[in-house]
Design a protein with these regions (language model features):
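Short acidic alpha-helical/loop segments enriched in Asp/Glu that coordinate divalent cations
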Residues: 292-303, 327-340
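Structured, contiguous alpha/beta core segments that scaffold functional sites
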Residues: 1-286, 290-293, 297, 303, ...
Length: 432
């Protein structure tokens, strides 16, 4: 098999195949150089992968998700009465909340590289519900006319009470598909598959450590006998049954027939086990672009740089995923006549908020310079608005400010000079 056939370069573009379901993609999974098999489920058994997936999935699921309407003046209006608002913000289907739905799909994205959901529509094409679909059971194809369609394999593991199994063909408009990074723009590649050796080494390190401590943190040793043993394996098994394992650690050994026990020391390279594990944790964090302090590595973190790292997490890690979600939701859920009128937005502003004093200073600058009203500030602080008659929507500026070209105009009069307000007040006091 050549490298082109492995990556599918030789295939025609009008026949895209879901690489996660294609046999030609299996080289990305399976055995690794560490000897450990890696797939989506074994990868989640490592704490680093589980932590990274959980951080990103919960971050996307917790963001406010709203439907907005474009306004003629260039602004936007939150539309609570749009049918999609309740589905996306509260309950996409009777079985799960919006948080659980988004958390599930985001987990699929981070593990398989693709997220799918079935779209239930009424006769007019309006969305009635969204149901997650497992990516490893989905195949993406094109028909002879070049139209994309989806084939979902349903079996008893998914729903034991359902009696009809087999492949279900769905139209593109009936599937919400959010792809991750991919080479053809249609199918995303699994991050776990692309980094299978790093994940495999992490699994191997964890297994090695577990085995080491299962033996009582004893690296092993040699039993020396002055004579010739007829059955060495029997002596070894007898020794291990009595002295091997955590429960048998620190027992006093009794040697017979002149036998001696010589312990084997831990080689220096094996003594670096903790450093190896720490490196592998950072390797997985690098895969998902997660700051080390968010997965528990605080070696190079301080009070001053953790806030900056958290802001960079929102900007460079979370924002690209948010854009993928927003554009996929708009493309799949909005009707053709709605796409120029409405848009769907995940709001990350709450994650970019600074400490209380910094926010108040920023609000003060915006308020004094006219780009914030009192209600603008109260909305960002999740407070109720002030009525219009009390000036809640007024935009104010400092009255002492003037244009540069008018800087000296107040001193001029028709005859030459004009008293300043301070001079006028001084003159009035003198006349009294």
């Amino acid at each position: 098999m050549g490298i082109k056939s492995l990556f599918g370069f030789g295939q025609a573009r009008d026949k895209p195949v879901d690489k996660a379901a294609d046999a030609g993609y299996s080289f990305l999974f399976g055995r690794t150089t560490s000897g450990k098999p890696v797939n989506e489920r074994t990868a989640m058994q490592t704490t680093a992968v589980y932590a990274c997936v959980r951080i990103l999935a919960e971050a996307v699921a917790s963001l406010p998700l709203h439907v907005y309407e474009y306004q003629d003046d260039g602004g936007k209006k939150l539309v609570h009465d749009h049918p999609l608002y309740y589905l996306l913000h509260d309950e996409p289907n009777p079985e799960m909340t919006s948080f659980v739905f988004r958390e599930t799909l985001m987990s699929h994205l981070l593990i398989w590289g693709n997220a799918y959901a079935q779209i239930i529509r009424d006769g007019a094409g309006r969305v009635l519900g969204l149901y997650p679909l497992l990516p490893d059971k989905m195949d993406v194809q094109r028909d002879d006319r070049g139209n994309i369609y989806y084939v979902y394999s349903r079996n008893s593991d998914e729903n034991p009470m359902f009696k009809e199994y087999g492949d279900i063909r769905m139209k593109a408009e009936d599937v919400l598909h959010i792809p991750g990074l991919g080479f053809d723009g249609l199918i995303g590649y699994s991050p776990i598959a692309m980094a299978k050796n790093a994940v495999g080494m992490t699994l191997a390190c964890e297994e090695y450590g577990a085995s080491f401590f299962a033996n009582g943190a004893n690296p092993g040793g040699v039993l020396e006998h002055p004579g010739v043993l007829k059955d060495p394996s029997k002596v070894r098994e007898s020794w291990n049954s009595v002295y091997r394992g955590v429960n048998n650690a620190h027992k006093i050994a009794v040697l017979e027939e002149g036998m001696k026990y010589q312990q084997i020391g831990i080689p220096p390279e094996e003594a670096q086990f903790l450093e190896t594990r720490k490196f592998q944790i950072n390797e997985i964090a690098r895969l998902y672009r997660i700051p080390p302090h968010m997965v528990g590595d605080l070696d190079k973190s301080s009070f001053s740089n953790i806030e900056q790292q958290s802001l960079e997490f929102v900007k460079y890690t979370l924002d690209p995923w948010v854009i993928r979600w927003e554009q996929s939701l708009q493309r799949s859920l909005l009707l053709p006549g709605e796409k120029g009128k409405y848009f769907i937005k995940l709001n990350v502003d709450g994650l970019l908020r600074g400490d209380y004093q910094s926010r108040m200073n920023g609000y003060a600058v915006g308020r004094q310079n006219g780009w914030f009203s009192a209600n603008d500030i109260r909305e960002m602080e999740n407070m109720n608005p002030i009525p219009d008659e009390q000036g809640g929507n007024l935009y104010l500026i400092n009255g002492a400010m003037t244009k540069l070209e008018d800087a000296g105009a107040f001193a001029k009069t028709d005859t030459g000079q004009q008293n300043t307000p301070a001079q006028e007040n001084s003159g009035k006091r003198g006349k009294r």
